[in-house]
Design a protein with these regions (language model features):
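Mobile beta-alpha loop/short-helix "lid" or hinge segments that flank ligand
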Residues: 94-99, 136-140
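C-terminal ends of transmembrane helices
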Residues: 49-54, 102-112
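Membrane-embedded alpha-helical segments that form the functional core of polytopic membrane enzymes
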Residues: 3, 10-64, 77-96, 155-174
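Active-site-adjacent helix/loop segment of glycosyltransferases
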Residues: 97-101, 121-124
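Small-residue-rich segments of transmembrane alpha-helices in multi-pass membrane proteins
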Residues: 20, 65-78, 118-133
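C-terminal membrane-associated helical module and adjoining short loops/tails
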Residues: 1-7, 35-38, 42, 110-242
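Structural signal for membrane-spanning alpha-helices in multi-pass inner-membrane proteins
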Residues: 19-26, 77-81, 102-106, 129-136, ...
């Protein structure tokens, strides 16, 4: 694996590590520090994608690894937010439904890449989540003026958190609906105009298959060739040992 590919995957790994430490950090340091950690994790989500495309090191492993990190981070983040406001339960439920829908699409051999709505959702979530954490611990944000702190503190908690998380909840719902639409109406313009190629699975022995899997999952050229294929079930078969 070349250095650039390592860097991209390490950035994704940082997000997973950040996810694991969110709850203990919140219990020890409160919302301000968790908000900062969340912001760093959201930035790695953007940076690793930008670098992967710029350096042309996108792979199927990276795409799945990144997707797993995103979902894990989002759900754990909202679980921590649930300790602050019950409104956080709504996006948790929607995220679980999105995962189920994506699994169904995958089982039907449909493309499970994030669409435009899903990509926009990430940034709306980032803003809402970070601001909610910071607002919950605003007394400990020392660089803010007393006027700003008093203004925020005078807003009832339910109203404040609904204002901050409302757009994120709306984007979660729109993303879910868009994926449901794609599941029932998969023949969109892209598929109609670009017929997907067939990923052929050669007959290999166990050792050869291991090498082939490595080349498939970690090969940027293979990813670029097949990233828009709808027949991803063939790729899934390559990951099986039997």
């Amino acid at each position: 694996m070349n250095l650039k590919l390592w860097i991209v995957n390490i950035l994704t790994l940082i997000r997973i590590i950040g996810t694991i430490i969110l709850i203990p950090i919140y219990n020890i340091y409160g919302g301000k520090v968790v908000g900062i950690v969340s912001l760093i994790c959201y930035l790695t989500d953007s940076i690793d994608g930008i670098l992967a495309r710029k350096w042309k090191v996108s792979t199927f492993f990276g795409a799945l690894f990144d997707g797993f990190a995103d979902k894990l981070f989002t759900i754990i983040n909202f679980i921590v937010l649930y300790l602050i406001t019950p409104y956080a339960l709504i996006p948790i439920i929607i995220e679980i439904l999105i995962i189920i829908i994506q699994m169904i699409k995958f089982s039907r051999n449909l493309n499970i890449q994030a669409n435009v709505v899903g990509k926009l959702k990430v940034w709306v979530l980032a803003i809402g989540v970070v601001l909610t954490f910071l607002a919950s611990d605003i007394d400990n944000i020392y660089f803010l003026s007393l006027e700003i702190k008093n203004f925020v503190l005078n807003i009832p908690d339910n109203n404040l958190y609904l204002i901050l998380l409302g757009p994120a909840i709306l984007m979660e719902l729109l993303t879910l609906l868009s994926y449901i639409f794609e599941m029932f109406f998969p023949k969109n313009i892209e598929i109609l105009t670009n017929k997907p190629s067939k990923i052929k699975i050669p007959k290999l022995n166990f050792e050869e298959k291991k090498d082939y899997i490595k080349n498939v999952w970690l090969s940027p050229s293979f990813y670029e060739k097949h990233k828009d294929d709808t027949n991803l079930r063939d790729l899934r078969k390559l990951s099986k040992k039997n």
